[in-house]
Amino acid sequence: MTPLIFVTGGVVSSLGKGIAAASLAAILEARGLKVTMMKLDPYINVDPGTMSPFQHGEVYVTDDGAETDLDLGHYERFVRTRLSRKNSVTTGRIYENVIRKERRGDYLGATVQVIPHITDEIRRCIDEATEGYDVALVEIGGTVGDIESLPFLEAIRQVRTERGPEKALFMHLTLVPYIGAAGELKTKPTQHSVKELRSIGIQPDVLLCRSEQAVPDSERRKIAQFTNVSERAVISVPDVDVLYRIPSGLHAQGLDEIVVNQLKLADKVGPVDLSMWEDAVDATLHPLDEVTIAVVGKYVDHQDAYKSVGEALKHGGLRQRTKVNLKWLEAQDLEGTDMAALADVDGILVPGGFGDRGFEGKVLTSKFAREQQVPYFGICYGMQAAVVDYARNVVGLEGANSTENDRQSPNPVIGLITEWRTATGDVEKRDDKSDLGGTMRLGLQEQRLKPGTLARELYGKDVVAERHRHRYEFNNRYRTQLEDAGLVIAGKSMDDTLVEVVELPRDAHPWFLACQAHPEFLSTPRDGHPLFIGFIRAARERKAGGKLLQEVRA
């Protein structure tokens, strides 16, 4: 039976439960434990795949093709465990499972209720996702007091009652606001949040107190007194200048020791090694170079929509001790302009997206990068924009477009995928009348790279695997025509049916590469990702006037 750490949040949302949980997981992993993580989301959607990026932020994709909450991206960037569909559960999925069982007759005619049927299904999902690990962290989305969260909170209360404190620990993240007019921190919101939690039968073992500044010992004692939590388990989590400081900050206050002692893990752990995180902090604070990258997207007003892209760019800089400044630009705003907003950047990245809004701005961005010799990295929709630009402006295919945006295009160089293999090798089919949810090409897919290409050089091997999330693809009818005009097809699916990577010859452009996959989902601060590292290096070389640079490793 895997020991569980349940992470809840109070007072307000967006306090950083996911980062806090991932930081603790990183410490426990650094002490030699096999760790996994899980997110329980209280919304009714089956998954976030069809949710607006403006509301929900990024949809993170796992190896097995699950469309999940962006917190799973935090988890995978902080710990080495590769997560799956089991690690992201929503209210919608829980109810879907229960209703399916009821229709099959699994409940033998019983009246199906929240307790015990919904809570039992939640507990079953927790057991399934956490089995076989030394310890698991389970984050409950939302805020204590939300009506949507009640079934999840009741389920974890039951787990604690049955397993006891040595197999289930409650960690509550709360806000300790600083009131500038009074010049002091206020603990009352935390007291009320814990009171709310205790009213439903959950007594926190650990409090993580989020604040603008460190919570002084006097306030920690006060919080401990009013919440029935040990003073040493009231942990201060102030704002930090570098995210990678958090594991060291939590370890310095003994959080991992509290967990190890309560969950009886002492015989499994060794001394902690946080050198990787310390090196990341040092490389971030003491860069040797600096570049500016334009990210031209559709949802830039809500930067969480491109969370993994932003992190992967920073990881690419981290491996070279280079500070990466991000210039977020709305693609639609570039349409009809002279593209002056891109004049001062060292590299351009065009990330994924859906729908016709802003697509022409992405095409113009690709054209600008191609003609002005600016390093260009296109991802998913960014690759499709690059192909459309090349077809229109180099090959001369009038009206070239994606059928996603123009079904009547005379030259549909990007079209709907009607058949493909899933991450497990099964054949999937769809048409333009299929449901939007769960009908894309999703998950980890292998691709073969062409010898002598930039992509092959960056990856350093012939066959690579990347995660995908798309339903439109390069139209093979135009493959030969575009190749004859100079476009390099650098990567294809293993069955040779889908174009995965395109680039320009290096004698025509210093660094122009676009891929259909989402390599940002496999980038971590430990290793970065070869495409992002190569892109940042190209941006550095452009800034240095084309001079080849010595690689500097963090």
UniProtKB/Swiss-Prot annotation:
Binding site for Mg(2+): D71, E139
Glutamine amidotransferase type-1 domain ranges (all copies): 292-545
Region (Amidoligase domain): 1-265
Binding locations of L-glutamine: G353, Y381, G382, M383, Q384, E404, R471
One GO term of the biological process aspect: 'de novo' CTP biosynthetic process
Gene Ontology CC: one annotated term: cytosol
EC number(s) stated in the UniProt entry for this protein: 6.3.4.2
Entries under SUPFAM superfamilies matching the protein: Class I glutamine amidotransferase-like (SSF52317), P-loop containing nucleoside triphosphate hydrolases (SSF52540)
PROSITE patterns: GATASE_TYPE_1
Assembly description: Homotetramer.
General remark: CTPSs have evolved a hybrid strategy for distinguishing between UTP and CTP. The overlapping regions of the product feedback inhibitory and substrate sites recognize a common feature in both compounds, the triphosphate moiety. To differentiate isosteric substrate and product pyrimidine rings, an additional pocket far from the expected kinase/ligase catalytic site, specifically recognizes the cytosine and ribose portions of the product inhibitor.
Name under which the protein is recorded: CTP synthase
Source organism of this protein record: Stenotrophomonas maltophilia (strain R551-3)
